[in-house]
């Protein structure tokens, strides 16, 4: 019998404490809020919106998947549009940071980097871009979590695009699409 060493084969990773820390930011939710004037581009009006998000876990908990739908209205109640987003996030062990990918029904696709700062989860697009986004989940008040979207143009100051108050929703009360 020959004593030969077998090659070590890579094994799938398992979720660590970083995913446990991330998990509390991704419950199924509904929300209402506002979109700032110029938030959807120069000259766009102020709007209101309501939406919903449902989350699941992928690859034995290594990734969190979010599917979101939001209806937007002019301040007089006139329907403007329905926006949908598919989001996948988790701990990137190699980069030692949270990473997320997003795709929406308007043809946008992006990659974001994230971090947890106390009760806030913050994702940003990379620094080198002329238009940067920052998404923040703020659980400082656990009874009234807030989600915000901000934009930074060519290194200028961050400007609020939209802000929403979230409420927990049962998994079967939220539908994707």
Predicted regions mapped to residue ranges:
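Hydrophobic small-molecule pocket/channel-lining residues, especially in calycin-type beta-barrels
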Residues: 1-177
């Amino acid at each position: 019998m020959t004593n030969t060493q077998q090659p070590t084969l890579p094994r799938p990773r398992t979720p660590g404490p970083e995913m446990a820390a991330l998990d509390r930011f991704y419950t199924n939710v509904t929300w209402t809020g506002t979109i700032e004037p110029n938030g959807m581009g120069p000259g766009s009006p102020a709007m209101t919106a309501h939406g919903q998000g449902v989350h699941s876990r992928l690859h034995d908990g290594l990734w969190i998947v979010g599917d979101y739908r939001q209806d937007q209205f002019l301040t007089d109640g006139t329907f403007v549009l329905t926006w949908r987003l598919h989001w996948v996030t988790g701990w990137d062990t190699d980069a030692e940071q949270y990473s997320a990918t997003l795709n929406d029904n308007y043809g946008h696709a992006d990659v974001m980097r994230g971090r947890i700062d106390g009760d806030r989860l913050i994702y940003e697009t990379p620094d080198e871009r002329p238009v940067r986004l920052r998404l923040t989940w703020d659980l400082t008040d656990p009874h009234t979590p807030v989600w915000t979207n901000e934009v930074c143009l060519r290194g200028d100051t961050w400007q609020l695009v939209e802000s929403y108050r979230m409420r927990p929703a049962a998994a079967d009360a939220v539908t994707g699409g």
